[in-house]
Amino acid sequence: MTTRVPAPLLALAAMVSVQLGAAIAKTRFDEVGSVGAATLRLVIGALVLALVVRPRVRHWTRAQWTAAVLLGLALGGMNVFIYVAFATIPIGVAVTIEFLGPLVLSLAHTRRWRDVSWAVLALAGVVLLGVGPTAVTAVAGVAAAVAAAVCWAGYIVMNQRVGAAIPGIDGLALSMVVAMLVSLPFGLHSAVAGVVDDPTLLLVFAGVALLSSVLPYALEMAALRRMVTRVFGVLQSLGPAIAALAGLLVLREALSVQEVVALACVTAASIGVTLSGRRRRAVP
């Protein structure tokens, strides 16, 4: 079925699915709290993935275990911190700040002065967010989004190592279990209390886990089989804009003009770095 759909549309659908799941999860923060929501998503996602994949870990080496555990720590931190950020700042702003993680990681590997312009553009976006009304009134949320950005950068690095060290998606399945364990001490109580009061929350967060984890992974995997990674990277750069749109439609979170300009700066810088990086790798 997915072979009939253009690959770029699959990649865009994956991003829309992720941000829609996040927006839906935020609508239930009053019942389970932000960390409780992250915990429910991770628990359901980890259990489903573990049951489907059934990772064969018996003969793993110490290096394979280390890589998978470190990936899980990064994944757990990324999910918990970004949900904490969602609780106090708009989703569009939080995802824009979080997106600085992979952007800075890309810039750290550059050796060309031309790419400095993209760093300056991204810095302009950071400054605009830093002096905007959201940053002034919700310092904790901004700090949580920055922590999520750091975890996202770590997730990218460790995901590459896990992919190289462990065949298939067995490493990802175990990493999801580790991420779940990371969240349990902080969100188990509020998650259980919310579910006891309203058992239908299990269905809601099963949908969130599907939208935020299972479906995007399947769509991205199908897209990457039929498109070059340069185009995929450019499309991924639209994440902050899609997050802002999801926040507006689902949560009525309107961004200020200053925040929209900041979002545009970070998105443009990410696209520029992606295109520049792919061109460099194409040169013999």
Where are the regions a protein language model picked out?
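Helix-helix packing/entry segments at the starts of transmembrane helices
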Residues: 40, 95-97, 158-180, 213-249
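Juxtamembrane C-cap of transmembrane helices in multi-pass membrane transport proteins
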Residues: 16-32, 44, 79-89, 97, ...
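Glycine-/small-residue-enriched transmembrane alpha-helix faces in small-molecule transporters
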Residues: 1-36, 73, 77-81, 124, ...
